[in-house]
């Protein structure tokens, strides 16, 4: 069984082919970073138009990479939400159309379920149950996962997502877009302890997050200090340490609350080196294990959508020809398998 996966929820066009026996057969990705760089963020209209240009050629490239033709595809999975509506409609329309033309099932996939399942692309994949930390530019959530579609929201950000805070603070430091990864590289040169940022909402019970205050704290710190390279690196280090510590504290609480011994990290920020090191330390002390995908599968990609589609194919598939996408879509609305 082979599933073609299509990801167009934001500013990456991702196409992949997943085989239930052989694993990942093809993975094609086009990033729109250069397209949006001059604007300092994603422009939805430009994103949609670029997905229109890139999606079909990338599907052709994926088929060629896998040595397959359309006749070898058994289902088409596409991201149906959450995300930018215009961008989602591109992938959904193409996915539905191809499925109809090829006479195979079309499977709408939840973008965050794709991220959550991405570590299962690795040889060392997690078993249920586990706590999932979904951490990206648009989401920061802690979720109890006891099976496919069996998701309970434990906590989430009440304002900025962690990845959004990274990008905004990077912009304050004068770093190029997208600034989060650049800030992390700069932080490696920073001095530990020169600046100390707060660990928001860790002094009270609960598993919710808040990162907007860190951005304000960073802005004030930048304004009140010199603009030399070392100072900027020290501020970057203090900011990253604060975010990483906050995430670690909340993850530890979630694991203690659920009694689970497995932690899954997913989403773009899960590729952060400092966060991975910290979580390895936390799980070692708890006698548990942390799982995450390789960096290229942490950010948006077609492989996670193809895998999620393969898994969802085992459940009930909607055969209607309607193209429905959702800008907002709670994970809790997904049916269990």
UniProtKB/Swiss-Prot annotation:
PROSITE patterns the UniProt entry points to: GLYCOPROTEASE
Keywords in alphabetical order: Acyltransferase, Cytoplasm, Iron, Metal-binding, Transferase, tRNA processing
Compartment(s) of residence: Cytoplasm
E.C. designation(s): 2.3.1.234
UniProt-annotated binding residues for substrate: 134-138, 167, 180, 272
Residues reported in the UniProt entry to bind Fe cation: 111, 115, 300
The protein's role, per its UniProt record: Required for the formation of a threonylcarbamoyl group on adenosine at position 37 (t(6)A37) in tRNAs that read codons beginning with adenine. Is involved in the transfer of the threonylcarbamoyl moiety of threonylcarbamoyl-AMP (TC-AMP) to the N6 group of A37, together with TsaE and TsaB. TsaD likely plays a direct catalytic role in this reaction.
Protein name as catalogued: tRNA N6-adenosine threonylcarbamoyltransferase
Gene (name only): tsaD
């Amino acid at each position: 069984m082979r599933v073609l996966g299509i990801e167009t929820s934001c500013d990456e066009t991702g196409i992949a082919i997943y085989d239930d026996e052989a694993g990942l057969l093809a993975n094609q990705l086009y990033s729109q970073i250069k397209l949006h760089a001059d604007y300092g963020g994603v422009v939805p209209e430009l994103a949609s138009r670029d997905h229109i240009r890139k999606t079909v050629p990338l599907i052709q490239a994926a088929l060629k990479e896998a040595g397959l033709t359309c006749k070898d595809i058994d289902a088409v999975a596409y991201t149906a939400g959450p995300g930018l509506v215009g961008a989602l409609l591109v992938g959904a329309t193409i996915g539905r159309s191809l499925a109809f033309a090829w006479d195979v099932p079309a499977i709408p996939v939840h973008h965050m379920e794709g991220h959550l399942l991405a570590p299962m692309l690795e040889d060392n994949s997690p078993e249920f149950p586990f706590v999932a930390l979904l951490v990206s530019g648009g989401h920061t959530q802690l979720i109890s996962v006891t099976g496919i579609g069996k998701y309970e929201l434990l906590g989430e950000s009440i304002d900025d997502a962690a990845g959004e805070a990274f990008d905004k603070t990077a912009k304050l430091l004068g770093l190029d877009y997208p600034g989060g990864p650049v800030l992390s590289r700069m932080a490696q040169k920073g001095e530990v302890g020169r600046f100390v940022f707060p660990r928001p909402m860790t002094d009270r019970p609960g598993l919710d997050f808040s990162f907007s205050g860190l951005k304000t704290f960073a802005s004030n710190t930048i304004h009140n200090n010199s603009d030399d390279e070392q100072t900027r690196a020290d501020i970057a280090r203090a900011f990253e340490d604060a975010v990483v510590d906050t995430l670690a504290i909340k993850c530890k609480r979630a694991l203690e609350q659920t009694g689970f011994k497995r932690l899954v990290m997913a989403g773009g920020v899960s590729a952060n080196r400092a966060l991975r090191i910290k979580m390895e330390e936390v799980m070692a002390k708890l006698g548990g294990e942390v799982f995450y995908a390789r960096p290229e599968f942490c950010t948006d990609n077609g492989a996670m959508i193809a895998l999620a589609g393969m898994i969802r194919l085992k459940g009930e598939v909607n055969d209607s020809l309607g193209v429905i996408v959702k800008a907002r879509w709670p994970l809790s609305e997904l049916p269990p398998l």
